[in-house]
């Protein structure tokens, strides 16, 4: 697991942005420590973070990106 700071450095997303993405349900941390509220991310979530960044460069709104990610998850479930 990566702390929000470590994940921020790797993904090139600010910690503020990661907190916002969590708030709107776009990119939820893999784990939030109930004792201190610290957010932790799985290395596999980096793919999602990079996809979000790529879609933003194509001028998709965050709501559109959220829809794309939700449909992607449904497709992956159906294919497994």
Residue ranges and their predicted role:
Residues 18-21, 52:
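Conserved hydrophobic/aromatic packing and binding residues within compact polymer-binding modules
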Residues 20, 33-34, 67:
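Proline- and acidic/polar-enriched loop/turn elements at helix boundaries
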Residues 1-17:
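Polyanion-binding surface elements
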Residues 31-49:
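Short helix-start
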Residues 3-4, 43-80:
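Arg/Lys-rich, alpha-helical DNA-contact motif
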Residues 7-8, 21, 65:
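Short alpha-helical "recognition helix" segments of helix-turn-helix
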Residues 25:
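Glycine-centered, phosphate/nucleic-acid-interacting loop/turn motifs that mediate DNA/RNA or nucleotide
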